[in-house]
Regions:
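Short alpha-beta junction capping motif
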Residues: 512-552, 631-633, 637
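Catalytic beta-strand/loop cores that center a nucleophilic Ser/Cys/Thr
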Residues: 537-540, 552-647
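Active-site-proximal beta-strand elements of phosphoester/diester hydrolases
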Residues: 109-114, 300-304, 511-516, 631-639
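Substrate-binding/catalytic cleft of secreted carbohydrate-active enzymes
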Residues: 146-396
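Short, solvent-exposed loop/turn segments at secondary-structure junctions
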Residues: 223, 252-253, 306-309, 382-385, ...
Length: 663
């Protein structure tokens, strides 16, 4: 059944009672009439609200896969006066049960991104539905089903577009009050109580009929008087219980009875985004947030996941053809030109973007692996050019791909059905590949007859192919007589996903010809030969990192890098499994390495690895480079080669082959 609240009936002669007829007609998308009803109404006052119930037994429910909408035509007749209105609506019921989200009795999982009100041509949001069909359609194309509007409520066109596309929206007031952003906290101003209560009620009244409006938060990262937020939430929820409510987006806090869910980066004091557990995530593909789910009494949504800085594409300056001037990108371009790295910008974008995509995948899969997790919200699929410039997106601020991943590639790990693979990342040839297989299964229908099709490749060669209904793998790696990187693809029906693992041969420790003092360095340059120059003799020692700058190197001042470019074909790396960009086999090496600045226009210095500088620092550095000096060929190595790990042993072996002239 459907409960309809009719429009307020305004009678201009309140002293006089009258009567009229209300006629309801419901049509489907094709215009077919699916329900009709006529009711007599007595009018008593200048304004009244009547309730009517229309049976609609065969109604199709609205959701992300079948966003069915109906049109209600309401006609009121009173004597010779006639008034008529049309309202679009969808049938759906959102609820929480056992700490899970249910839409019409079926569990849903949120895969979201955040809209931070970026409009580079106008400075304000479009008011036509077509523009939002394109903008929101991009999120849908990338496999997402959810958009959170960060500290703002979008216009009618957004809800209409989301209704049509089948997107689950979270809406907020323009409420972002905490001292960290240099504004008062909630309740510091007496006007907060009346203004924000009325704002929340107005949002509910204006947009409440839209089926896409599933979630409401008072605002972003609010601190202060939570009793005021509780009053607002309780009041609005009592009037309109058709959606779910939370006090604020972000900040773990004692949950109140009016809250249906928690959106934060910590839940019950457990992290729910990889930022706070990168070392654990680097060890394997098994990280999840089960402890947070167990200890939190409501569904948990991980807040602002990602925020991995990608080097900016300043070529977008030419695209600002409207009211906005990109003075931030103009400044970035000027700094890059002054530092002599502007011509490398596309290489920097590719390298930093590749790392960001890898880390976004890890963040997303950790959420998908977590049983009964509420979902995640990325920050963000697109760049955010405010707050001192945060180019954290795989798409630019115009919503265009940076060429890092296609939508289809992104959907493989962020869509409604995603195969998952839990295993270590680094093995030796004496071990077995032990892995657990599972399926994140939130498609239109549950997957039947689950079968995993597993293919493991080394380059183009198939190392192993297995079809199994068992969710476990136990594969010997002893047939490999060399170190290798293996690509594991797990397919279930038409859905597939891939991971890279690294297998290191049982390599003995290698002694490297090394110069230890400035005098030894000077001598070999005179006599000739090859030798390793350790970090102690670097002209400067700049710390390296694997995880890129968080959010923005301007907002959070940092000299950290944003990825690394690798000359994988260089002879010094012929024995070390790597591609052109860093993967997890490099994490421990890079985080214990130092680099030196690459001199401008010095062809004697040939970087094998080049750190991608952040756009505020723009200092190109290298932890591993060949330097031709005098008669010598010197291998400057900033890696700590003392740990007895498979990766270090293999890198030393590979470097040793180069220094000995074997490659």
């Amino acid at each position: 059944e459907m409960c309809i609240r009719d429009r307020a009936c305004n009678v201009h002669s309140p002293e006089r009672q009258d009567s009229g007829t209300l006629r309801f007609q419901i049509a489907d998308a094709d215009g077919g009439i699916v329900a009709e009803q006529q009711n007599s109404v007595r009018l008593f006052t200048s304004k009244q609200v009547n309730y009517f119930t229309l049976p609609l037994p065969s109604a199709h429910r609205w959701n992300e896969f079948t966003p069915t909408q109906y049109t209600l035509v309401t006609e009121f007749r009173c004597g010779d006066d006639v008034d008529c209105t049309e309202t679009k609506f969808g049938m759906r019921c959102i609820a929480v049960q056992d700490k899970k989200f249910y839409l019409d009795g079926r569990q849903i999982s949120l895969r979201g991104t955040i809209d931070c009100a970026q409009f580079p041509l106008t400075g304000y949001p479009a008011m036509d539905k077509d523009a939002w069909l394109q903008r929101l359609g991009t999120a849908k194309e990338y496999g997402l089903n959810h958009v959170r509007f960060h500290a703002w409520c979008p216009p009618e066109a957004v809800f209409a577009a989301a209704d049509e596309l089948g997107l689950y929206l979270s809406v907020e007031m323009p409420l972002w009050l905490n001292h960290d952003v240099h504004v008062p906290e909630v309740g510091d101003d007496p006007a907060h109580r009346s203004y924000f209560l009325q704002e929340a009620l107005t949002i509910s009244r204006t947009y409440g009929n839209h089926p896409s409006f599933l979630f409401f938060s008072n605002g972003n990262e609010n601190l202060g008087d939570f009793s005021l937020l509780e009053e607002i939430t309780t009041a609005v929820k009592a009037i309109d219980p058709r959606r779910l409510y939370t006090l604020t987006s972000n900040f773990d806090h004692p949950l109140l009875p009016c809250e249906d869910y928690l959106c934060a980066f910590r839940a019950a004091d457990h992290p729910v985004r990889i930022q706070h557990c990168q070392d654990r995530a680097a060890e394997n593909t098994a990280l999840d947030y089960a402890d947070a789910v167990a200890d939190t009494p409501v569904p948990v949504i991980s807040f602002e996941v990602g925020q991995y800085c990608v080097y900016p594409d300043t070529d977008c300056i030419a695209d600002y053809s409207g009211a906005m001037r990109p003075i931030n990108f103009e400044a970035v371009r000027k700094l890059a030109q002054q530092s002599g790295v502007h011509e490398k910008r596309q290489d920097y974008i590719d390298a930093s973007g590749n790392l960001a995509a890898k880390l976004y995948k890890e963040d997303i899969e950790a959420a998908l692996r977590t049983q009964d997790f509420g979902g995640f919200e990325l920050l963000s699929l697109t760049d955010y050019t405010g707050q001192k410039t945060a180019t954290v997106g795989l798409l630019d601020v115009f919503g265009r791909s940076k060429g890092i991943l296609t939508a289809d590639e992104f959907r493989r790990f962020a869509g409604p059905v995603v195969p998952l693979f839990k295993a270590k990342r680094i093995f030796t040839t004496t071990e077995f590949l032990d892995a657990a297989l599972s399926l994140y299964d939130f498609g239109p229908e549950p997957t039947q007859d689950l079968c995993y099709d597993v293919t493991i490749r080394e380059g183009d060669a198939v190392f192993c192919h297995i079809k199994t209904r068992k969710p476990m793998l136990h594969i010997p790696l002893s047939s490999l007589d060399h170190s290798a990187q293996l690509d594991v693809t797990v397919a279930v029906g038409t859905y597939s996903n891939s991971w890279r693992i690294f297998v290191f041969a049982d390599t003995p420790d290698t002694a490297l010809p090394t110069v230890h003092t400035p005098a030894e360095l000077e001598k070999i340059c005179e006599t000739g030969g090859r030798a390793l120059v350790p970090r102690e003799l670097f002209p400067e020692q700049i710390p390296c990192n694997f995880i890129p700058v968080f959010w923005s190197p301007v907002f959070f001042p940092s000299k950290a890098s944003c990825g690394v470019m690798i000359n994988a074909a260089h002879p010094a790396l012929q024995g070390f499994p790597t591609k052109a960009y860093a993967d997890y086999q490099w994490k421990g090496l890079l985080e214990n390495a130092v680099a030196f600045c690459i001199p401008k226009n010095d062809k004697a210095v040939q970087p094998i690895l080049e750190n991608v500088p952040n756009f505020y620092d723009n200092t190109p550095t290298t932890p591993l480079a060949v330097v031709h000096k005098g008669k010598a060929t010197l291998l400057y190595c900033g890696f700590d080669l003392t740990p007895d790990t498979p990766a270090v042993r293999q890198l030393k072996n590979s470097l040793g082959c180069f220094l000995s002239g074997k490659v």
